[in-house]
Amino acid sequence: DFDGVRELFLGNADVQAVVKLDAHAALCELDAYGLAHNFGDALTQRAEHYYHKLDAVPEAGSEQAGIASAHDRVAFKDVIVPADVAPDARPRRLFADAWQRLDGETAWPQYAAAAFKAPLMSAVFTSPLDGGEVTKTITLAGRTLQVGYRLRNVPGGRFSVELNLALPSCDGYSGRYVLTDSSIPCGFGQALDLAVSQRLTLDDRVLGGGLVLSASRPVDIKARPHYTVSQS
């Protein structure tokens, strides 16, 4: 994307994962070849050249005769407020980590990459964290992407991992969450909160497949829809 940041490509016959080699050590791309889909497609909100059109007032009609040019017509499908187009302070990627201290403050690990050797199936990153250290390992194993964390000598707090996922379906029956017991609590367009869970499936009928999120130990899961503003 010509942002000047080096990228590390991990790949096999099923999956390609692209990691930004910056302090976040997060994925900017996750390609599933069998589904022909990138789960890490660009979701970071940036300033776009067409946002100035949001200041225009949609007109119900025109006094002039003839058909208005499509380039001059401004109409909004949904109500858009300034906060909807505010640039993101941090990039929206997969496996973006944060550390919530007991005093309520938030710290973000500043990862540094270890040495890499071909063939690239795994990568290791480390970061100091409140007097201790966190190690992050990203590994490909067939159609599975494994991301492991090990915290050493870190004081009390809460470690959170954010996954910004791009899927064809956002709302409606075609995009829904499936729990371990095969029940469907809601669709991608609704908020979902799970306590002490180890598995959640994102089933997308438009995609023709799904994504299974699993954890080695019980975790709290918060899932929310993400809305963007685009010109079409």
Q: What function would you assign to each model-found segment?
A:
Residues 2-15:
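Acidic, glycine-anchored loop motifs typical of Ca2+
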Residues 7-9, 124-126, 150, 201:
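Residue-level detector of beta-strand face positions
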Residues 11-13, 33, 128-132, 205:
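Short strand-coil-strand connectors
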Residues 15-21, 134-138, 209-215:
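Broad, structure-driven detector of short, well-ordered beta-strand segments within folded domains
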Residues 18-90:
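Catalytic core of carbohydrate-active enzymes
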Residues 50, 221-232:
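Active-site pocket scaffolds in enzymes
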Residues 76-148, 231-232:
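Extended, loop-rich substrate-binding clefts of extracytoplasmic carbohydrate-active enzymes
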Residues 143-146, 150-220:
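Polysaccharide-binding surfaces and accessory modules of carbohydrate-active proteins
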